[in-house]
């Protein structure tokens, strides 16, 4: 894991120890090589689907998809993209809940590679350390930018924040629409999936848990 930030190393190790890491196999393929190979195979796939890649609307599609996969929607598979995290001492002795809600979640279902679209809410009780608020959003985005299962993504965000804050007192909930349900299969356009991960006092204290969940209404 050379070249990774200390925060990225800590989070990756914590997820691996808990069996919560996204299934991945490391390789030595560079970013540009990945794009070239994906573009090549995507060209084959689209050709098999009888699309005319000489058409000016389609000719760049394999390249666009390869770039999108590596640089954007699957960039969270690469821990060198883990956000730079600012964690500081809680010198103000803040002890009340910090909650960030309506965090945009745009991810990809790992079963069908279609969109998961929703909102996340994250809360923690400050102890010895506090984290810059925008860093919470960035951590959510990092774990969303990979093929995902919503249940695991929720747990990954929880463990990442617990690790960085050195505190179990973290809560995460995600409400999302899965396009593998909306646009195919049962084709249910209105259902949402809610997942929640609770740690520390959020799990052990009903009043704290209720305060977190009530604030999301």
Swiss-Prot record:
Keywords, alphabetical: GTP-binding, Hydrolase, Metal-binding, Nucleotide-binding, One-carbon metabolism, Zinc
Disulfide linkages recorded for this protein, renumbered to the chain, are none
Output one GO MF annotation.
Answer: GTP binding
Source organism (scientific name): Vibrio parahaemolyticus serotype O3:K6 (strain RIMD 2210633)
Q: Which GO terms describe its cellular component?
A: cytoplasm
Q: Does the keyword Hydrolase apply?
A: yes
The highest taxon in the source lineage is Bacteria
- Which GO annotations describe the biological process of this protein? one-carbon metabolic process; tetrahydrobiopterin biosynthetic process; tetrahydrofolate biosynthetic process
Instruction: Report the catalytic activity.
Output: GTP + H2O = 7,8-dihydroneopterin 3'-triphosphate + formate + H(+)
User: Could you say which EC number(s) this protein's record lists?
Assistant: 3.5.4.16
Official protein name in the record = GTP cyclohydrolase 1
As for family, the record states:
Belongs to the GTP cyclohydrolase I family.
Report the InterPro entries cross-referenced here. GTP-CH-I_C/QueF (IPR043133), GTP-CH-I_N (IPR043134), GTP_CycHdrlase_I (IPR001474), GTP_CycHdrlase_I_CS (IPR018234), GTP_CycHdrlase_I_dom (IPR020602)
Oligomer and partners: Toroid-shaped homodecamer, composed of two pentamers of five dimers.
Question: What is the gene name?
Answer: folE
